[in-house]
């Protein structure tokens, strides 16, 4: 097993996740099987109860794990399926060690950070790195480990020490370290001092970088690269210029141009790994398709405008998987994506009274959009604005996709304005609401007291109902009888309303294994009015976009029938089939 650690200095949020994912993707183009582990040095057990406005999106895995959004990047770039154990947090590892101490596993010893916690971290990495994550079912060849936060922070100290020990545990030829650092541009001059200081701190902790990935807003000058190499005690070929590009999907090709993969091949002695001709061919096909996809991104001419009506729009990372699913879909449809961010509260009548400019700007975006998306969320704030956007899409035949809360919002709006249930709402927003008006209800099996990990989580099946051959969403899924998608919710559509809703044209075409819980609806006689209780964005891949999102973008571009017919596929020669 080979290990590539990606750490960061100077500041957090510098792009370690994208660089780690891109490095893994390039290793896959060699035919290698790659897995990933993310280390998050916070005390939370997982990301499930964190505010999206503080931490960004909570990414849900097949096994129901609620994790850091970077695991979404790994799954999208590497086309793998990770587990909750691929996300190590301080809370998890401390809980693990304390549980072992309580069981008596340490035989009365004084349990300390070193060696007990650091050993536990190393053992965790070794165990999880061997879990098969792709469709081959075989043990991975390489594990990418991203160390979250900034090296030197007190929170990450135990993990840094564990990795220092780990390099000797696995052997130098099996361990490589890439350190990501910032090269700011001040008054037109590229400054290297922050990188020099970051590498000095890293070396003082016992970790020596094999490569330094320099993040900069512009291409690094040759003299700057040579200066960093000299003062950081590495060769010039070990300094990688990761400047800003049009899209993060170009980063793997940027690294490829700078021969990063050649250096890692030599440094980790990758020639020792036995690969079949099928493995090598699969890697070559991946690189060819990736170039095709990025070519589509660069050559896309027509713009498709999607209004994203949400409640966490102040931090775009709150909807990272949604954004990526839209990007994947737009690249497949050969369209340039324009996301128009709409804060849901700005659509509500109260805003017209207090902030008219915001109100009119928000409605201008909604009314001029090619398609409307209402994503997931929690709480009542902004829900009336979301309902107004849903109604606009329904009545004006604008393509619409609702996800999780979006499905519930669209159903409530339909019940109010089509069924005449004027007081219809969700038990989440108004727990004391009369049962006759509860369009959305609390799921009976869910724990009302415990917040963490208590939702309906993870991969679950959805079955298409009989007589649904007409619906676009089923066709997008290849007319499959059932699909498996990831869930994260506590509330569901009230089964008592389903018959009335369907009588008026809102058809619940997909349900769970009990045939009672509604998973997908689609409206008849509408270009595309679809919503899902599950989160399809979590399984969207760069070369295999999420089907509901693909449907939204295709319908918004006027090419839904062509996409369903398979006329927009990557063929590996830099162009799509269409």
UniProtKB/Swiss-Prot annotation:
- Which pathway does the record list? Pyrimidine metabolism; CTP biosynthesis via de novo pathway; CTP from UDP: step 2/2
Kindly indicate whether the keyword Ribosomal protein belongs to this entry: no
Q: Which residues form the Glutamine amidotransferase type-1 domain?
A: 305-559
EC number per UniProt: 6.3.4.2
Q: Which GO terms describe its cellular component?
A: cytoophidium; cytoplasm
Q: Name one GO molecular function term.
A: identical protein binding
Q: Name one Pfam family in it.
A: CTP_synth_N
Keywords, in A-Z order: ATP-binding, Glutamine amidotransferase, Ligase, Nucleotide-binding, Pyrimidine biosynthesis
Q: Where is the active site?
A: 404, 535, 537
Q: Which family does it belong to?
A: Belongs to the CTP synthase family.
Q: What does this protein do?
A: Catalyzes the ATP-dependent amination of UTP to CTP with either L-glutamine or ammonia as the source of nitrogen.
Q: What is this protein called?
A: CTP synthase
Species of provenance = Candida glabrata (strain ATCC 2001 / BCRC 20586 / JCM 3761 / NBRC 0622 / NRRL Y-65 / CBS 138) (Yeast)
Q: What is the lineage of its organism?
A: Eukaryota, Fungi, Dikarya, Ascomycota, Saccharomycotina
């Amino acid at each position: 097993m080979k290990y590539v650690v990606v750490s960061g200095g100077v500041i957090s949020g510098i792009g370690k996740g994208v660089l780690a994912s891109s490095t893994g993707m390039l290793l896959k183009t060699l035919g290698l099987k790659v897995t990933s582990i993310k280390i998050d040095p916070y005390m939370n057990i997982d990301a499930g109860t964190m505010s999206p406005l503080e931490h960004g999106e909570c990414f849900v895995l097949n096994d129901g794990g609620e994790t850091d959004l970077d695991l979404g990047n790994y799954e999208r770039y590497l086309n793998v399926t990770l587990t909750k154990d691929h996300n190590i947090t301080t809370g998890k590892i401390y809980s693990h060690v304390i549980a072992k101490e309580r069981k008596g596993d340490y035989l009365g010893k004084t349990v300390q950070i070193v060696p007990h916690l650091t050993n536990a971290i190393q053992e965790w990495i070794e165990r999880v790195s061997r879990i098969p994550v792709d469709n081959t079912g075989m043990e991975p060849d390489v594990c990418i480990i991203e160390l979250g936060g900034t090296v030197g922070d007190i929170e990450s100290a135990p993990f840094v020490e564990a990795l220092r020990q780990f390099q000797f545990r696995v052997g130098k030829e099996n361990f490589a370290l890439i350190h990501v650092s910032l090269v700011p541009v001040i008054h037109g001059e590229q400054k290297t001092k922050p990188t020099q200081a970051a590498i000095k701190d890293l070396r003082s902790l016992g970790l020596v970088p094999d490569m330094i990935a320099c993040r900069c807003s512009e291409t690094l000058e040759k003299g700057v690269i040579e200066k960093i190499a000299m003062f950081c005690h590495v060769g010039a070929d070990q300094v990688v210029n990761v400047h800003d590009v049009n899209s993060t999907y170009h980063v793997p090709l940027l690294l490829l141009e700078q021969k990063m993969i050649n250096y890692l091949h030599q440094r980790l002695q990758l020639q020792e790994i036995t690969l079949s001709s099928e493995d090598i061919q699969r890697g070559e096909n991946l690189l060819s398709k990736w170039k095709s996809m990025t070519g589509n991104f660069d050559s896309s001419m027509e713009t498709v405008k999607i209004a994203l009506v949400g409640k966490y729009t102040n931090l775009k990372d709150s909807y990272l998987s949604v954004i990526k699913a839209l990007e994947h879909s737009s690249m497949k449809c050969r369209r340039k994506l324009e996301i128009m961010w709409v804060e849901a509260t700005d659509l509500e009548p109260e805003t017209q009274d207090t902030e008219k400019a915001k109100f009119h700007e928000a409605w201008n975006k909604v009314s001029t959009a090619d398609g409307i998306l209402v994503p997931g969320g929690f709480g009542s704030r902004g829900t009336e604005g979301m309902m107004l956007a849903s109604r606009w899409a329904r009545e004006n035949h604008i393509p619409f996709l609702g996800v999780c809360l979006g499905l519930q919002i669209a159903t409530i709006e339909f019940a109010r304005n089509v069924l005449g249930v004027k007081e219809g709402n969700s038990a989440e927003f108004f727990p004391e609401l009369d049962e006759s008006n509860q369009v959305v209800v609390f799921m009976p099996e869910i724990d009302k007291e415990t917040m963490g990990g208590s939702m309906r989580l993870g991969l679950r099946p959805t079955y298409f109902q009989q007589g649904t051959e007409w619906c676009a969403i089923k066709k997008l899924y290849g007319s499959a009888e059932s699909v498996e998608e990831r869930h994260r919710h506590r509330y569901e559509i009230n089964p008592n309303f389903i018959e009335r809703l369907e009588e008026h044209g809102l058809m619940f075409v997909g349900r769970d294994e009990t045939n009672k819980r509604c998973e997908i609806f689609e409206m008849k006689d509408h270009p595309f009015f679809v919503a899902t209780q599950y989160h399809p964005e979590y399984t969207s891949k760069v070369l295999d976009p999420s089907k509901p999102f693909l449907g939204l973008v295709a319908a918004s571009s006027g090419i839904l029938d062509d996409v369903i017919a398979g006329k927009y596929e990557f063929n590996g020669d830099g162009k799509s089939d269409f």
